Amino acid sequence: MTSRFTHRPAFRPASRSLAAALAASAMLAFTIPAARGAEALTVFAAGSTGGALATIAHDYTAATGQPVKLVTGPAGLLLERIEGGARADLFISANLAHPRRLTAEGKAGPTVVFARNRVCVSARPDVGLTSAKLLDKLLDPGVKIGTSTPKADPGGDYAWLLFEKAGTLRAGATAVLEAKARQLVGGRSAPEVPAGANPVKYFMQTHVVDVFVGYCSSHDTQPDPAFVQVELPPELAIQADYGMTVLEGRHDEAPWRFAMYLMSPAAQAVLPRYGFGAVGLADPGS
């Protein structure tokens, strides 16, 4: 199935009782407004959540007066910053492993699933990418593949998982794809792009790569007609669970209130607009 960045994946709904409980918890966040001049909450979050979280944080601040500072980037590098002593109140990663590591280290509370995503492949229309022929196209010697950086960014880890799965379908495919892939974003030494440019789109527009293995979600709510986004076929499909945890160190309830709000139907309803699966809605596609 091919679309022009309009595909929005379906996900299994959370239970209605859970949604009701989260709704009640979220109401508590609104009943106690932040004190005048309240210290901003610092949220370290995976770069792919930037658009959705900016909207959610804006709504929360407007309703409660609580300022929220978003710091987005490759989740693996954000994890390193936290472990190195960087101050953050919440951490949202594009995987569960990173926040669970902080939980196990005693640096954070329990880890919960905040949202779900899927891996998609984006391309210029002239590439002719389709879901049915996706693996053939990726293996084509003339097609240049871009990815994020494994270990530094879960997006790169998911790309390498895709390559591993490809190897179970075609002998030798894993080695071919790993050799072809260019790690262009998400690392410490990623190539520079013009100020304000979207790196993934820039590298495809300038033909540095022809396709890019990334997420089905987007930073924007409107599709970009300059590119197509293709869902992985069922035999290659990859789901990404996004983990969230509240970090130790702050001596008030503000981080926990915001965390509960993030899991509420009000906040979760924003996620599908950006292509994420919502775990806190009875109908995650609504």
What does each of the following model-derived ranges do?
Residues 1-14:
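N-terminal secretory signal peptides that target proteins for export/translocation
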Residues 109-110:
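Periplasmic N-terminal soluble interaction domains immediately after the signal peptide in Gram-negative
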